[in-house]
Amino acid sequence: MIPGELHIADGIIELNVNREKVIVMVINNGDRPIQVGSHFHFYEVNNALFFNRNFALGFRLNVPSGTSIRFEPGQTREVELVRYSGELKIVGFCKKIMGKLSK
């Protein structure tokens, strides 16, 4: 094996199988593009993004790790969110939630 070399299994690798997911419609009401990363707590994204935040509590974008979605000014798009797993401790981000979520 070469340092840094990756051995990836053959076939399709499915992400977030059997995890709770929701789809939300998001509108960028701002005058600048907004980019949201794969593991950012979607409930706490920029306030210029308009959507029903109640559906996003405890969820993140359902995209591969390290990627993001960009919302252009005035753009409306549908995104799929996936529930965080583990202990559900949400800390940091924009400090709107600083603790453990109930399941």
Swiss-Prot record:
InterPro entries: Urease_beta-like, Urease_betasu_sf, Urease_subunit. It is found in: Cytoplasm. Keywords: Cytoplasm, Hydrolase. One of its GO terms (cellular component) is urease complex. This is Urease subunit beta. GO terms for biological process: urea catabolic process. It is an enzyme of class 3 (hydrolase). NCBIfam families: PRK13203.1 (NF009682), urease_beta (TIGR00192). Heterotrimer of UreA (gamma), UreB (beta) and UreC (alpha) subunits. Three heterotrimers associate to form the active enzyme. Belongs to the urease beta subunit family. It catalyses: urea + 2 H2O + H(+) = hydrogencarbonate + 2 NH4(+). Pathway: Nitrogen metabolism; urea degradation; CO(2) and NH(3) from urea (urease route): step 1/1. Its EC number is 3.5.1.5. Its main location: cytoplasm.
